[in-house]
Amino acid sequence: VVVEDRPMPTLLESTDAVIKLAASCICGSDLWPYRGAQPVDHQQMGHEYIGEVIEVGDDVKTVKPGDFVVGSFCISCGECATCQDGYPSRCLKAIAAGDGFIGMRSNGTQAEYARIPFADGTLVKTPAYPTAEQIPHLMAASDVLGTGWYAADAAKAGPGKTIAVVGDGAVGLGAVIGAKQLGAEKIIMMSRNPKRQELAKQFGATHVVEERGEEGIAKVLELTDGVGAHGVVEAVGTQQAFDQALGCVRHGGYIGFVGVPHDSSIGTDVLFGKQVHLEGGPAPVRKYLPTLIDLIYKGEIEPGKVFDLVLPIDEAPKGYEAMDQRTATKVLLTM
């Protein structure tokens, strides 16, 4: 990872906006190319962002220069059939334009400025300019909180339900917040990291399971009267994590999987036998942003606590190293 000067992003389409970032961050998924597991060639990194709009195209109607905005890592028009169905992360217009994700046709957002395609369908204006304390919380909403919330929603978190979370990274911790806010009665965090266990408890976890594999599954079954969790969040993306999620869920239960898959497969025979409901993929964060922003401004959630290392963007390589070595849960980059 290197930090270098690049040309200032410009409007490419009449539906674009250019923003000046207030902060960015490093995502767990950024570690896959960092570790060589995903081929890249001088790719400008970053897909999480908040900041001030400085320029908009002629067809942008919902945001204007001077507005502070939060956006999703997936681009969405807000109008196509897929967006209307509640899955803006798979926007038909954005994919057709080559702009399905931040950074595909323009710079990534680990940068001072960024072009945001389909601004009307991607960006959400905040009710007021944020305080310094609110910046990390809004930054988390851009991806990890929204992704975790989606996973908890897909796992059908709700009153009287038990939700297990596999993965104690920022997304898994965001899922704990989501499960709590959606009303889950029992939230089981599967984690061996004492610092992350404590944060999970602050966010609403009622139980912590340190065991993994079959031992971890047995512990979750013990906590659920031998039946299993109503829903499980899988927030890692490995075979071991998915197998653990499948073992922890009850018959007829739900798995919300948002860990980016790497060399993993789904045992359809087990899915069939347990009658498991399965939903996952790139999170439709844009759908949840108005709710998340409202909760943050009301002070009801503090997702920015996942950031345990703050660095200026010039020191981004140190942040990658810290997350790779798991000495940091999530790194906030300041401009």
Residue locations for each model-derived region?
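Glycine-rich beta-strand-centered segment in the early N-terminal region that forms part
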Residues: 9-25, 34-84, 106-107, 127-133
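NAD(P)H dinucleotide-binding glycine-rich loop of Rossmann-like/cofactor-binding domains
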Residues: 79-166
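Glycine-centered, small-residue-biased loops immediately flanking beta-strands
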Residues: 253
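Rossmann-fold NAD(P)-binding glycine/threonine-rich loop
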Residues: 259-275
